[in-house]
């Protein structure tokens, strides 16, 4: 038989090798060709003057918004001190040299060959697509994006300095920095990778059992203890009267194994990342019970981050990484790019999923597994802002469910790890009248408002918890 065909062997595929000569299937070949064409189109779009201007403004606006969560505060500050003084004040509080360094200047890079880890899920879209679209190389970086099997491995490789930066679950840098589950190692969240983009998926056998009050005894999967998935699932169950520690079982399952566990009947459902919610529908083993945006619209999920040591030793390299990932997020936010992005990130070296599955997730036009086609444009989005109030909420849930014991300095931890600095201190230094209290935005989860200035009061409102 030739190296391409083996038509009379029952134990081998008919077509052994692609006609291009490479050792992959024709289907993989077509996916790669489509991905290359889509990447070329997106690269061309990224090089237009229109996108260059949009991207630059997006990055700078993101940085300024980090310091001024409230629009009126930003306007008052600028009117009071003027543009130049404001830029100087802002520059002094950013985590790298200056606003211009973050937004446009390219200082000498301390390190150019970098290894960045990722889990193959759509949450990592900005980090992944920056590679084939050339956003890293445009910043002078030679980046290897490395597919990783699970979150514990991501944690260990960051602690052991095998990765320079990584795709994190957004609560992970908090947990790692505090020494929860591993030796304490200071980590930072540079940007949120995605908002929304998760779902509660149930086995098809439960399609007539949609009321969570009836789920006592269910077995659920989540990707990691320190994940928004775990915290949101626990929140949802508790709001419906179930104790997540005694009335159900919650198991840690790597995202790539969730659909197989659902198919095998090992779990009744999971709150997990896409594309695996949509893949369960695609494989006809599950249905989408609820998008997490319906629990908390705009909630964070994953983050892009690195160690505090890396930032301190490589400030210009970190700034270059920051620019590359924010440029990618700017492109991912534009709905007109989503179908092309699905082609770029679906092949084997990235997500290894059917393009149709990824496209449904990113465009928000999807089959729900119950016979309906849904149209939810903001099913997944890419807002990079690491609000410190998000970190405070995560810390409240860690305390609520017994992951943290004793007193918690919420504000100090949030401001140390999530790289946004409150502008109020610098307004005061400039002689401006400053309202009392931290300038964190408020959030609404299942109809209940969360005020990051009052975390302990918030915790006292919950009847179901694991606090002493």
Roles of regions detected by a PLM:
Residues 200-201, 303-306, 310-311:
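Short glycine- and hydrophobic/aromatic-rich loop-to-beta-strand nucleating segment
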Residues 162, 167-170, 177, 204, ...:
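Sec/Tat-exported extracytoplasmic proteins
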Residues 81-89:
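Sec-dependent signal peptide hydrophobic core
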Residues 395-468:
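Conserved C-terminal helix/tail region of periplasmic/extracytoplasmic solute-binding proteins
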Residues 104-252, 261-278, 284-298, 439, ...:
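Short, glycine-/small- and polar/acidic-enriched structural segments
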């Amino acid at each position: 038989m030739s190296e391409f065909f083996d038509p009379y062997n029952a134990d081998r595929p008919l077509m052994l090798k692609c006609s291009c000569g490479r050792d992959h299937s024709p289907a993989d070949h077509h996916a790669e060709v489509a991905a290359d064409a889509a990447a070329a189109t997106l690269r061309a779009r990224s090089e237009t003057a229109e996108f260059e201007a949009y991207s630059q403004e997006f990055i700078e606006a993101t940085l300024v918004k980090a310091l001024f969560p409230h629009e009126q505060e930003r306007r008052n500050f600028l009117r009071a001190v003027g543009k130049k003084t404001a830029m100087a004040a802002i520059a002094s509080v950013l985590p790298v040299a200056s606003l211009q360094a973050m937004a446009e200047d390219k200082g000498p890079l301390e390190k150019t060959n970098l290894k960045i880890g990722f889990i193959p899920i759509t949450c990592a879209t900005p980090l992944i697509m920056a590679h084939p679209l050339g956003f890293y190389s445009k910043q002078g970086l030679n980046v290897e994006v490395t597919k990783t099997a699970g979150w514990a491995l991501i944690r260990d490789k960051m602690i052991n300095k095998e990765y320079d930066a990584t795709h994190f679950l957004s609560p992970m840098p908090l947990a790692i920095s505090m020494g929860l589950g591993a030796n304490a190692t200071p980590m930072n969240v540079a940007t949120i990778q995605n908002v929304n983009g998760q779902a509660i998926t149930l086995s098809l056998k439960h399609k007539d059992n949609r009321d969570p009050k009836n789920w006592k005894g269910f077995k659920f999967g989540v990707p990691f203890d320190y994940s928004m998935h775990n915290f949101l699932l626990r929140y949802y169950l508790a709001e419906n009267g179930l104790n997540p520690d005694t009335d159900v079982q919650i198991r840690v399952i790597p995202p790539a194994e969730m659909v197989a566990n659902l198919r095998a009947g090992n779990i009744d459902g999971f709150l997990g990342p896409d594309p695996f919610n949509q893949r369960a529908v695609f494989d006809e083993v599950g249905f989408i019970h609820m998008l997490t945006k319906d629990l908390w619209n705009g909630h964070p999920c994953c983050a892009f981050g690195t160690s505090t040591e890396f930032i301190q030793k490589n400030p210009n390299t970190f700034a270059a990484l920051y620019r590359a990932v924010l440029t990618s997020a700017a492109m991912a936010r534009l709905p007109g790019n989503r179908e092309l992005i699905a082609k770029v990130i679906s092949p084997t070296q990235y997500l290894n999923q059917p393009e149709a599955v990824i496209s449904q997730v990113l465009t928000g036009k999807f089959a729900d597994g119950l016979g309906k086609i849904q149209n939810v444009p903001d099913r997944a989005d890419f807002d990079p802002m690491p609000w410190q109030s998000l970190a405070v909420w995560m810390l409240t849930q860690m305390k609520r469910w017994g992951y943290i014991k004793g007193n918690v300095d919420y504000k100090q931890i949030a401001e140390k790890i999530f790289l946004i600095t409150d502008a109020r201190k610098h307004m005061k230094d400039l002689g401006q009248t400053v309202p009392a209290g931290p300038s964190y935005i408020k959030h609404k989860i299942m109809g209940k408002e969360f005020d990051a200035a009052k975390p302990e009061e918030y915790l006292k409102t919950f009847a179901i918890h694991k606090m002493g």
